[in-house]
Amino acid sequence: MQNSPLTADCSLNAGRPLTIGLVAGETSGDILGAGLIRALKVQVPNARFVGVAGPLMQAEGCEAWYEMEELAVMGVVEVLERLPRLLKIRKDLTQRFSELSPDVFVGIDAPDFNITLEGRLKQRGIRTIHYVSPSVWAWRQKRVFKIGKATDMVLAFLPFEKAFYDRFNVPCRFIGHTMADAMPLVPDQQAARAELGIAPNATCLALLPGSRHSEVEMLSADFLRTAVILRDKLPNLEVVVPLVNSKRREQFERIKAEIAPDLSVHLLDGKARVAMIASDAALLASGTAALECMLAKCPMVVGYRMKPFTFWLAERLVKTPYVSLPNLLAGEELVTELLQQECQPQKLAGALLPLLQGGSEIAALKERFLVLHQSIRCGADEQAAQAVLELADR
Protein backbone atom coordinates (compact mmCIF):
# COMPACT_ATOMS: atom_id res chain seq x y z
CA MET A 1 0.00 0.00 0.00
CA GLN A 2 1.39 3.40 -1.00
CA ASN A 3 2.04 5.84 1.80
CA SER A 4 -0.07 9.00 1.83
CA PRO A 5 1.84 12.30 1.94
CA LEU A 6 1.01 12.78 5.60
CA THR A 7 2.08 9.34 6.79
CA ALA A 8 5.08 8.77 4.58
CA ASP A 9 8.34 7.26 5.72
CA CYS A 10 10.74 10.06 6.64
CA SER A 11 13.83 8.92 4.73
CA LEU A 12 14.74 9.01 1.08
CA ASN A 13 15.91 5.93 -0.80
CA ALA A 14 19.42 7.12 -0.10
CA GLY A 15 18.66 7.14 3.62
CA ARG A 16 18.73 10.92 3.84
CA PRO A 17 16.05 12.69 5.91
CA LEU A 18 13.53 14.81 4.08
CA THR A 19 15.41 18.01 3.23
CA ILE A 20 13.62 21.29 2.54
CA GLY A 21 15.30 24.45 1.28
CA LEU A 22 13.70 27.72 2.37
CA VAL A 23 14.30 31.41 1.71
CA ALA A 24 12.35 34.08 3.63
CA GLY A 25 13.09 37.74 3.03
CA GLU A 26 11.07 39.62 5.63
CA THR A 27 9.26 39.26 8.96
CA SER A 28 5.96 38.10 7.43
CA GLY A 29 7.86 35.39 5.56
CA ASP A 30 9.61 34.33 8.76
CA ILE A 31 6.20 33.83 10.40
CA LEU A 32 4.96 31.75 7.45
CA GLY A 33 8.17 29.75 7.33
CA ALA A 34 8.02 28.94 11.03
CA GLY A 35 4.42 27.75 10.70
CA LEU A 36 5.32 25.57 7.71
CA ILE A 37 8.27 24.02 9.54
CA ARG A 38 6.11 23.27 12.59
CA ALA A 39 3.46 21.58 10.44
CA LEU A 40 6.06 19.54 8.54
CA LYS A 41 7.79 18.38 11.73
CA VAL A 42 4.49 16.94 12.96
CA GLN A 43 4.52 14.59 9.95
CA VAL A 44 8.28 14.17 9.48
CA PRO A 45 10.02 14.77 12.82
CA ASN A 46 13.57 14.28 11.51
CA ALA A 47 13.20 16.57 8.48
CA ARG A 48 16.02 19.02 7.79
CA PHE A 49 15.39 22.69 6.97
CA VAL A 50 18.06 24.97 5.56
CA GLY A 51 18.38 28.30 3.77
CA VAL A 52 17.72 31.97 4.60
CA ALA A 53 15.77 32.26 7.83
CA GLY A 54 14.65 34.73 10.44
CA PRO A 55 14.61 34.17 14.21
CA LEU A 56 11.26 32.35 14.25
CA MET A 57 12.30 29.85 11.58
CA GLN A 58 15.63 29.32 13.31
CA ALA A 59 13.82 28.71 16.60
CA GLU A 60 11.92 25.90 14.81
CA GLY A 61 15.20 24.33 13.75
CA CYS A 62 15.98 25.89 10.36
CA GLU A 63 19.71 26.08 9.64
CA ALA A 64 20.46 29.61 8.39
CA TRP A 65 23.09 29.99 5.70
CA TYR A 66 22.20 33.69 5.72
CA GLU A 67 20.19 35.83 8.11
CA MET A 68 16.86 37.04 6.77
CA GLU A 69 17.86 40.67 7.34
CA GLU A 70 20.33 40.34 4.46
CA LEU A 71 17.36 40.32 2.07
CA ALA A 72 15.04 42.72 3.91
CA VAL A 73 15.73 45.84 1.85
CA MET A 74 13.04 48.44 1.11
CA GLY A 75 13.10 51.34 -1.34
CA VAL A 76 14.69 51.80 -4.77
CA VAL A 77 17.83 53.56 -3.50
CA GLU A 78 18.43 50.98 -0.78
CA VAL A 79 17.99 48.09 -3.23
CA LEU A 80 20.45 49.66 -5.67
CA GLU A 81 22.99 50.17 -2.89
CA ARG A 82 22.67 46.54 -1.79
CA LEU A 83 22.28 45.02 -5.26
CA PRO A 84 25.83 43.62 -5.59
CA ARG A 85 25.47 41.89 -2.21
CA LEU A 86 21.99 40.54 -3.07
CA LEU A 87 23.20 39.16 -6.40
CA LYS A 88 26.17 37.54 -4.69
CA ILE A 89 23.90 35.89 -2.12
CA ARG A 90 21.56 34.60 -4.82
CA LYS A 91 24.46 33.16 -6.81
CA ASP A 92 25.83 31.46 -3.70
CA LEU A 93 22.41 30.06 -2.77
CA THR A 94 21.98 28.70 -6.30
CA GLN A 95 25.29 26.87 -5.95
CA ARG A 96 24.69 25.57 -2.43
CA PHE A 97 21.13 24.40 -3.05
CA SER A 98 22.26 22.75 -6.29
CA GLU A 99 24.91 20.81 -4.36
CA LEU A 100 22.50 19.94 -1.53
CA SER A 101 19.65 19.03 -3.91
CA PRO A 102 16.81 19.41 -1.37
CA ASP A 103 13.64 17.40 -1.92
CA VAL A 104 11.73 20.67 -2.33
CA PHE A 105 12.75 24.33 -2.35
CA VAL A 106 10.22 26.82 -0.94
CA GLY A 107 10.64 30.51 -1.73
CA ILE A 108 8.52 32.44 0.77
CA ASP A 109 7.23 35.71 -0.68
CA ALA A 110 10.12 38.10 -1.69
CA PRO A 111 9.25 37.45 -5.36
CA ASP A 112 11.91 39.70 -6.89
CA PHE A 113 14.59 37.60 -5.19
CA ASN A 114 12.96 34.19 -4.99
CA ILE A 115 11.34 33.64 -8.37
CA THR A 116 14.65 33.93 -10.22
CA LEU A 117 16.26 31.61 -7.67
CA GLU A 118 13.39 29.14 -8.03
CA GLY A 119 13.81 29.16 -11.80
CA ARG A 120 17.52 28.39 -11.59
CA LEU A 121 16.94 25.55 -9.15
CA LYS A 122 14.12 24.10 -11.21
CA GLN A 123 16.45 24.01 -14.23
CA ARG A 124 18.76 21.86 -12.09
CA GLY A 125 15.99 19.36 -11.37
CA ILE A 126 14.96 20.64 -7.92
CA ARG A 127 11.22 20.86 -7.25
CA THR A 128 10.18 24.39 -6.34
CA ILE A 129 7.27 26.07 -4.57
CA HIS A 130 6.53 29.77 -4.37
CA TYR A 131 4.66 30.47 -1.14
CA VAL A 132 2.43 33.60 -1.29
CA SER A 133 1.37 34.71 -4.72
CA PRO A 134 2.54 38.12 -5.87
CA SER A 135 -0.33 40.38 -6.94
CA VAL A 136 -0.05 39.26 -10.56
CA TRP A 137 -3.85 39.13 -10.79
CA ALA A 138 -3.92 42.91 -10.16
CA TRP A 139 -1.00 44.27 -12.18
CA ARG A 140 1.99 43.20 -14.30
CA GLN A 141 0.02 40.08 -15.20
CA LYS A 142 2.67 38.83 -17.63
CA ARG A 143 4.76 37.85 -14.59
CA VAL A 144 2.57 34.74 -14.43
CA PHE A 145 4.57 33.21 -17.29
CA LYS A 146 7.88 33.65 -15.44
CA ILE A 147 6.32 32.21 -12.29
CA GLY A 148 5.00 29.24 -14.27
CA LYS A 149 8.46 28.48 -15.65
CA ALA A 150 10.15 28.90 -12.27
CA THR A 151 7.87 26.89 -10.01
CA ASP A 152 6.21 23.51 -9.74
CA MET A 153 3.52 24.95 -7.47
CA VAL A 154 2.27 28.32 -6.20
CA LEU A 155 0.63 28.38 -2.76
CA ALA A 156 -2.10 31.02 -2.71
CA PHE A 157 -3.87 32.59 0.27
CA LEU A 158 -7.01 33.58 -1.64
CA PRO A 159 -9.36 31.64 -3.94
CA PHE A 160 -9.41 34.25 -6.72
CA GLU A 161 -5.62 33.93 -6.95
CA LYS A 162 -5.93 30.24 -7.78
CA ALA A 163 -8.62 31.05 -10.35
CA PHE A 164 -6.18 33.46 -12.01
CA TYR A 165 -3.37 30.89 -12.21
CA ASP A 166 -5.78 28.26 -13.52
CA ARG A 167 -6.44 30.51 -16.53
CA PHE A 168 -2.76 30.22 -17.45
CA ASN A 169 -2.37 26.52 -16.54
CA VAL A 170 0.11 27.34 -13.77
CA PRO A 171 -0.17 24.79 -10.91
CA CYS A 172 -1.56 26.59 -7.88
CA ARG A 173 -3.02 25.40 -4.59
CA PHE A 174 -5.38 27.53 -2.52
CA ILE A 175 -4.41 26.93 1.11
CA GLY A 176 -6.43 29.58 2.92
CA HIS A 177 -5.02 32.55 4.81
CA THR A 178 -2.92 32.25 7.97
CA MET A 179 -4.54 35.42 9.34
CA ALA A 180 -7.97 33.81 9.01
CA ASP A 181 -6.67 30.81 10.96
CA ALA A 182 -5.30 33.05 13.71
CA MET A 183 -8.39 35.21 14.27
CA PRO A 184 -11.57 33.98 16.00
CA LEU A 185 -14.73 33.66 13.94
CA VAL A 186 -16.62 35.63 16.61
CA PRO A 187 -14.37 38.31 18.17
CA ASP A 188 -14.93 39.48 21.74
CA GLN A 189 -15.63 43.20 21.34
CA GLN A 190 -16.15 43.87 25.05
CA ALA A 191 -12.82 42.25 25.98
CA ALA A 192 -11.09 44.38 23.35
CA ARG A 193 -12.75 47.52 24.72
CA ALA A 194 -11.73 46.64 28.25
CA GLU A 195 -8.12 46.25 27.08
CA LEU A 196 -8.18 49.70 25.47
CA GLY A 197 -10.20 51.47 28.17
CA ILE A 198 -13.20 52.09 25.91
CA ALA A 199 -16.63 52.19 27.59
CA PRO A 200 -18.91 49.26 26.67
CA ASN A 201 -21.70 51.56 25.47
CA ALA A 202 -19.51 54.08 23.59
CA THR A 203 -19.52 54.47 19.82
CA CYS A 204 -15.98 53.72 18.68
CA LEU A 205 -14.19 54.62 15.44
CA ALA A 206 -10.74 53.32 14.48
CA LEU A 207 -8.50 55.38 12.21
CA LEU A 208 -5.73 53.44 10.45
CA PRO A 209 -3.88 55.78 8.09
CA GLY A 210 -1.34 53.18 6.98
CA SER A 211 2.08 51.92 7.95
CA ARG A 212 4.28 53.81 5.48
CA HIS A 213 5.50 57.38 5.94
CA SER A 214 3.91 58.42 2.63
CA GLU A 215 0.51 56.98 3.60
CA VAL A 216 0.41 58.64 7.01
CA GLU A 217 1.48 61.94 5.44
CA MET A 218 -1.12 61.72 2.67
CA LEU A 219 -4.12 60.41 4.64
CA SER A 220 -3.92 61.55 8.28
CA ALA A 221 -5.26 65.07 7.79
CA ASP A 222 -8.39 63.96 5.95
CA PHE A 223 -8.92 61.06 8.36
CA LEU A 224 -8.74 63.49 11.30
CA ARG A 225 -11.10 65.98 9.62
CA THR A 226 -13.50 63.09 9.07
CA ALA A 227 -13.36 62.19 12.77
CA VAL A 228 -14.10 65.82 13.72
CA ILE A 229 -17.22 65.82 11.50
CA LEU A 230 -18.40 62.55 13.04
CA ARG A 231 -17.67 63.73 16.59
CA ASP A 232 -20.01 66.69 16.03
CA LYS A 233 -22.78 64.27 15.01
CA LEU A 234 -22.02 61.62 17.65
CA PRO A 235 -20.96 63.34 20.90
CA ASN A 236 -20.05 60.07 22.64
CA LEU A 237 -17.71 59.00 19.81
CA GLU A 238 -14.40 57.48 20.92
CA VAL A 239 -11.57 57.53 18.38
CA VAL A 240 -8.72 55.02 18.51
CA VAL A 241 -5.62 55.32 16.33
CA PRO A 242 -3.20 52.37 16.29
CA LEU A 243 0.20 53.26 14.80
CA VAL A 244 2.83 50.74 13.80
CA ASN A 245 5.86 52.35 15.45
CA SER A 246 7.13 55.43 17.26
CA LYS A 247 8.07 57.22 14.02
CA ARG A 248 4.56 56.93 12.62
CA ARG A 249 3.15 58.02 16.00
CA GLU A 250 5.30 61.16 16.06
CA GLN A 251 4.33 61.89 12.47
CA PHE A 252 0.61 61.48 13.23
CA GLU A 253 0.83 63.61 16.39
CA ARG A 254 2.46 66.42 14.40
CA ILE A 255 -0.33 66.37 11.83
CA LYS A 256 -3.03 66.16 14.51
CA ALA A 257 -1.63 69.19 16.37
CA GLU A 258 -2.08 71.20 13.19
CA ILE A 259 -5.38 69.79 11.90
CA ALA A 260 -7.43 68.72 14.94
CA PRO A 261 -5.74 69.82 18.18
CA ASP A 262 -8.98 69.61 20.19
CA LEU A 263 -10.01 66.13 19.02
CA SER A 264 -9.55 63.57 21.79
CA VAL A 265 -8.09 60.30 20.50
CA HIS A 266 -6.60 57.14 21.98
CA LEU A 267 -3.18 56.72 20.37
CA LEU A 268 -2.05 53.09 20.46
CA ASP A 269 1.36 51.53 19.93
CA GLY A 270 0.46 48.72 17.57
CA LYS A 271 -2.70 46.87 18.69
CA ALA A 272 -4.40 47.41 15.33
CA ARG A 273 -6.27 44.12 15.61
CA VAL A 274 -7.56 44.91 19.10
CA ALA A 275 -8.62 48.37 17.90
CA MET A 276 -10.56 46.86 14.99
CA ILE A 277 -12.34 44.36 17.22
CA ALA A 278 -13.20 47.10 19.73
CA SER A 279 -14.58 49.50 17.12
CA ASP A 280 -18.00 49.91 15.54
CA ALA A 281 -16.37 51.04 12.30
CA ALA A 282 -12.94 51.76 10.87
CA LEU A 283 -11.51 54.20 8.34
CA LEU A 284 -8.40 52.73 6.83
CA ALA A 285 -5.94 52.71 4.00
CA SER A 286 -6.21 49.77 1.63
CA GLY A 287 -3.98 46.72 1.94
CA THR A 288 -3.80 43.82 4.37
CA ALA A 289 -5.46 46.01 7.02
CA ALA A 290 -8.76 45.79 5.13
CA LEU A 291 -8.63 41.99 5.24
CA GLU A 292 -7.76 42.05 8.95
CA CYS A 293 -10.64 44.43 9.59
CA MET A 294 -13.03 42.09 7.78
CA LEU A 295 -11.80 39.18 9.89
CA ALA A 296 -12.35 41.35 12.99
CA LYS A 297 -15.98 41.76 11.78
CA CYS A 298 -15.55 45.53 11.85
CA PRO A 299 -17.44 47.49 9.17
CA MET A 300 -15.10 49.81 7.30
CA VAL A 301 -14.56 52.49 4.71
CA VAL A 302 -11.39 52.37 2.62
CA GLY A 303 -9.91 55.79 1.90
CA TYR A 304 -6.76 56.15 -0.15
CA ARG A 305 -4.89 58.88 -1.94
CA MET A 306 -1.55 58.91 -3.73
CA LYS A 307 0.41 61.40 -5.76
CA PRO A 308 -1.47 62.29 -8.99
CA PHE A 309 1.03 60.69 -11.37
CA THR A 310 1.19 57.51 -9.26
CA PHE A 311 -2.61 57.26 -9.30
CA TRP A 312 -2.73 57.92 -13.06
CA LEU A 313 -0.24 55.10 -13.56
CA ALA A 314 -2.08 52.75 -11.18
CA GLU A 315 -5.37 53.30 -13.01
CA ARG A 316 -3.72 52.05 -16.19
CA LEU A 317 -1.82 49.14 -14.65
CA VAL A 318 -4.28 47.69 -12.12
CA LYS A 319 -6.65 45.18 -13.71
CA THR A 320 -9.14 44.65 -10.87
CA PRO A 321 -12.48 46.42 -10.26
CA TYR A 322 -11.74 46.93 -6.55
CA VAL A 323 -8.69 47.73 -4.44
CA SER A 324 -9.71 46.19 -1.09
CA LEU A 325 -9.46 42.49 -0.36
CA PRO A 326 -12.96 42.17 1.17
CA ASN A 327 -14.48 43.39 -2.10
CA LEU A 328 -12.19 41.22 -4.20
CA LEU A 329 -13.14 38.18 -2.12
CA ALA A 330 -16.85 38.97 -2.28
CA GLY A 331 -16.82 39.89 -5.96
CA GLU A 332 -18.89 42.97 -5.15
CA GLU A 333 -18.59 46.24 -3.24
CA LEU A 334 -19.26 45.20 0.34
CA VAL A 335 -16.94 47.94 1.56
CA THR A 336 -17.08 51.55 0.35
CA GLU A 337 -13.86 52.59 -1.42
CA LEU A 338 -13.21 56.33 -1.72
CA LEU A 339 -10.06 56.88 -3.72
CA GLN A 340 -8.07 59.94 -4.75
CA GLN A 341 -10.41 62.92 -5.35
CA GLU A 342 -13.26 60.96 -3.71
CA CYS A 343 -11.21 60.66 -0.50
CA GLN A 344 -12.66 63.81 1.10
CA PRO A 345 -13.73 64.27 4.74
CA GLN A 346 -17.41 64.95 3.98
CA LYS A 347 -17.70 61.86 1.77
CA LEU A 348 -15.74 59.69 4.20
CA ALA A 349 -17.93 60.84 7.10
CA GLY A 350 -21.08 60.26 5.06
CA ALA A 351 -20.04 56.67 4.38
CA LEU A 352 -18.99 56.01 7.98
CA LEU A 353 -21.98 57.50 9.80
CA PRO A 354 -24.47 54.69 9.01
CA LEU A 355 -21.84 52.12 9.98
CA LEU A 356 -21.38 53.78 13.37
CA GLN A 357 -25.14 54.08 13.93
CA GLY A 358 -25.69 50.35 13.48
CA GLY A 359 -28.88 48.63 12.36
CA SER A 360 -29.98 45.55 10.46
CA GLU A 361 -27.75 46.29 7.46
CA ILE A 362 -24.70 46.17 9.72
CA ALA A 363 -25.71 42.77 11.09
CA ALA A 364 -26.05 41.49 7.52
CA LEU A 365 -22.64 42.93 6.60
CA LYS A 366 -20.99 41.23 9.57
CA GLU A 367 -22.64 37.96 8.53
CA ARG A 368 -21.08 38.34 5.07
CA PHE A 369 -17.72 38.97 6.73
CA LEU A 370 -18.18 35.76 8.74
CA VAL A 371 -18.96 33.71 5.63
CA LEU A 372 -15.88 35.12 3.86
CA HIS A 373 -13.78 34.40 6.95
CA GLN A 374 -14.90 30.77 6.93
CA SER A 375 -14.10 30.49 3.21
CA ILE A 376 -10.40 31.28 3.75
CA ARG A 377 -9.97 29.57 7.15
CA CYS A 378 -8.51 26.30 5.91
CA GLY A 379 -5.50 25.53 8.14
CA ALA A 380 -2.93 27.21 5.90
CA ASP A 381 0.17 25.87 7.68
CA GLU A 382 -1.04 22.29 7.38
CA GLN A 383 -2.20 22.79 3.79
CA ALA A 384 1.21 24.21 2.85
CA ALA A 385 2.95 21.28 4.55
CA GLN A 386 0.81 18.79 2.66
CA ALA A 387 1.66 20.50 -0.65
CA VAL A 388 5.38 20.23 0.16
CA LEU A 389 5.09 16.55 1.08
CA GLU A 390 3.10 15.72 -2.04
CA LEU A 391 5.68 17.44 -4.24
CA ALA A 392 8.41 15.51 -2.42
CA ASP A 393 6.49 12.25 -3.13
CA ARG A 394 6.07 11.58 0.59
UniProtKB/Swiss-Prot annotation:
Native species: Yersinia pestis
Protein name (database record): Lipid-A-disaccharide synthase
Gene Ontology cellular-component terms listed: membrane
This protein's pathway: Glycolipid biosynthesis; lipid IV(A) biosynthesis; lipid IV(A) from (3R)-3-hydroxytetradecanoyl-[acyl-carrier-protein] and UDP-N-acetyl-alpha-D-glucosamine: step 5/6
Record's keyword annotation contains Chaperone: no
Gene Ontology BP annotations: lipid A biosynthetic process
Known EC number: 2.4.1.182
Keywords: Glycosyltransferase, Lipid A biosynthesis, Lipid biosynthesis, Lipid metabolism, Transferase
InterPro entries in UniProt: Glyco_trans_19 (IPR003835)
Annotated family: Belongs to the LpxB family.
Role noted for this protein: Condensation of UDP-2,3-diacylglucosamine and 2,3-diacylglucosamine-1-phosphate to form lipid A disaccharide, a precursor of lipid A, a phosphorylated glycolipid that anchors the lipopolysaccharide to the outer membrane of the cell.
HAMAP family (UniProt xref): LpxB
Pfam families: LpxB
GO molecular function: lipid-A-disaccharide synthase activity; phospholipid binding
Catalysis: reaction(s): 2-N,3-O-bis[(3R)-3-hydroxytetradecanoyl]-alpha-D-glucosaminyl 1-phosphate + UDP-2-N,3-O-bis[(3R)-3-hydroxytetradecanoyl]-alpha-D-glucosamine = lipid A disaccharide (E. coli) + UDP + H(+); a lipid X + a UDP-2-N,3-O-bis[(3R)-3-hydroxyacyl]-alpha-D-glucosamine = a lipid A disaccharide + UDP + H(+)
